[in-house]
Amino acid sequence: MKVLTIHDLKIIKKRAEGTLLLREESNETVATQCCGLALGTEHLQILICGGTGCKASDSHIIAERLQQALERNNIADKVDIITTGCFGFCEKGPIVKIIPDNTFYTQVVPDDADEIVGEHIIGGRKIERLLYIDPKTEKTVSDSKHMDFYRKQMRIALRNCGFIDPENIEEYIALDGYMALADSLLHKKPEEVIDVIKRSGLRG
């Protein structure tokens, strides 16, 4: 579809919003639970970090192994595998995140794929050995939202990293991608654009 107007962007946005809706951060009650086909979860997503560090540690092979495991179990139509941008926690990569319960698995290797599919995706049981261990409490933390490393951050420019597929333009548009550009080109004079940038406080 060729995008010529803001209306065109809104059509794409509406079409892609449903996919991203499943990735919305869960509330605290849901975050302590687990999803899985055996528990009645109708559809799941597996987010895999595709950043440089994780890819160097075989995250792309993990994605392939997960896809193969889904196909062997005849559930590939119930689970989407999505390669995202960097989660920002390279020390703990490769990172795999299960949606909708937001379980955050760290230092995953290709040989973990069958267990992730069998135990978590199908069985609805979190894999304790792959969960992040808080260095202060020495307790496992299953949701990145409750990790000190992330809790103290407020991402702005990088807020979509680890959330969308950087190679899927529709996912970017679903989060209002290009809306500001379209507004500037179609509705604002050059002087107004300059004024907005000045008032924004952006530098560099």
Describe each model-derived feature in a short phrase.
Residues M1-G204:
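Feature of Fe-S/electron-transfer and energy-metabolism proteins
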